[in-house]
């Protein structure tokens, strides 16, 4: 899939007849489906154990694709419906327009498997308000569409029942590309949902502003709040090395 996407996007980049790109997930059960759940973890594990060089090739090609998307010269619209995690974030966060729905489940869960937020996570997580990026990068918390909007990981949230109409607008053959794009954006604006900031605990910023993982863990351990206890319990099950790497990565991404 990575190679196919790269090849197609490069062809479209050079094609003057292609004015914009829109990307979505699909499923057998309907026109729209989960956007992208990321890489095949079983493949990663087996390849690492066996010393399969395809593992290095995969990551090299994936990161090339991410770079291509983040620097794409034409409008690139990502309809982030359903699951959008890991690699799915890598092919959506560089979009000109990021659209989520009430069905979206957005996350960078790499620390769950002893990895760090890759696919551009060191670039887009620092752009979250305050120190939410550090919190999301270390915990891998799954956000709804409207929560992702509050974290600056989406531009608009809409009801999923409006997706088919938006796609139909873009597929219209009776309007110019510019008119279709403007109509699509206008329709999204009219049906947009409000961001949900209710999940942003007041302790997030004062805790995750710290530079060292040990300081963050100590603050969480000493706090009496339910949020801190749950967060401490969660992080205690993760690799300290990879959490430290992730924290440093996101801090450096601010500069």
List the predicted regions and their residue ranges.
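Conserved CoA-thioester-binding segment of acyl-CoA-metabolizing enzymes
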Residues: 1-24
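Hydrophobic/aromatic residues within transmembrane alpha-helices
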Residues: 23, 40, 91-92, 147-148, ...
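Amphipathic alpha-helical blocks and their helix-capping loop/short-beta junctions
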Residues: 153, 158-238, 242
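Contiguous mid-protein beta-loop-alpha structural module that forms a pocket-lining wall or clamp
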Residues: 120-177
């Amino acid at each position: 899939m990575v190679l196919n996407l790269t090849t197609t996007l490069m062809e479209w980049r050079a094609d003057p007849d292609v004015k914009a790109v829109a990307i979505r997930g699909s499923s057998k059960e309907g026109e729209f489906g989960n956007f992208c759940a990321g890489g095949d973890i079983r493949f990663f594990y087996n390849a690492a154990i066996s010393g399969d060089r395809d593992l290095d090739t995969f990551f090299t090609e994936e990161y090339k694709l991410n770079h291509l998307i983040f620097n794409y010269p034409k409008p690139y619209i990502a309809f982030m419906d359903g699951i959008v995690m890991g690699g799915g974030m890598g092919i959506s966060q560089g979009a000109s327009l990021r659209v989520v729905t009430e069905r979206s489940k957005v996350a960078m869960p790499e620390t769950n498997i002893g990895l760090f937020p890759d696919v551009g996570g060191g670039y887009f997580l620092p752009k979250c308000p305050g120190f939410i990026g550090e919190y999301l990068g270390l915990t891998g918390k799954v956000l709804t569409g409207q929560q992702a909007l509050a974290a600056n990981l989406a531009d608009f949230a809409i009801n999923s029942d409006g997706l088919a109409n938006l796609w139909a607008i873009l597929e219209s053959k009776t309007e110019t590309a510019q008119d279709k794009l403007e109509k699509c954006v206008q329709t999204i604006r009219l049906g947009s949902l409000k961001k949900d900031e209710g999940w942003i605990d007041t302790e997030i910023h004062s805790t995750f502003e710290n530079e060292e993982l040990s300081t963050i863990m100590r603050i969480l351990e000493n706090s009496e709040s339910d949020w801190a206890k749950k967060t401490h319990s969660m992080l205690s099950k993760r690799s300290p090395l990879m959490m430290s790497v992730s924290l440093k990565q996101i801090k450096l991404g601010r500069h």
